[in-house]
Amino acid sequence: RPADIPSLCLLLREAYAAHIPVIILGMGSNVLLPDGVFGGILIITRDLRNIEINGTKATAECGASLNSLILRCAAADLGGLELLYGIPASVGGAAYMNAGAHGVSFGTSVLCLEAYDPRTDRIVTLSNEELAYAYRKSALQAQSTLAVTRLTLSLNPTPEDVIRARIREVVHRRALSQPLALPSAGSAFLRPCESLEVWRLVDACGLRGYRVGGAAVSEKHAGFIVNCGGATARDVRLLMDHIRAAVLARHGVTLIPEICIFE
């Protein structure tokens, strides 16, 4: 757990020079790590959580939680991200995958982003245009060596009480629709298109509650895979494979994992 950005860069530089594989995690959401021993370095960025507000802009380090950022912005009467409240992501992870909910995408608010490149031992700055945000996508996903360090967001002046009312509504909706009582990696698959919801496709295959080992399709929301106890990465992968095969056979739709799977 690096204590600051220079320490993170040093660790990444030395790992790259020694050809040691690295996995970087913020909050660990939407990630499936391999079973057994990982033969590399696992970096946790949660101590890199500084947030600064300047006018209508907020700058946050990669390990800051998305919820903390939203609340800090709310206290400064800055909105735009509040519908994302409750997503258990770090700021870096949200930027990497373009986290979204309720029609709002994180990337829309990103003004620019700093990322360390161990190949050149430099921190590069990428504009919103260069990040090429799309549905759950960013240019970062094609740049395997870049590590997000800090980013700046452009926000909208909004009264704090309005923001907090929206947050309360989002929290209520999540509690009603999502399996928050059980561990999960979040939404298992990307929505194939705007008109197709994954949970409906899975439900039509009769897979709600279907189980492989300790992993199961959530009874509450068929778009989630939950850990009912003792689930392994293999359980989750086998269940995802079964779901994909069933949906393809019934609907002719190929589901793409939203979970980032490390082999």
Question: Which residues make up each language-model segment?
Answer:
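A gly/ser-rich beta-alpha-beta helix-loop segment of oxidoreductase catalytic cores
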Residues: 74-76, 80-112, 184
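Structural signature of FAD isoalloxazine-binding scaffolds in flavoprotein oxidoreductases
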Residues: 1-5, 32-50, 96-128, 143-150
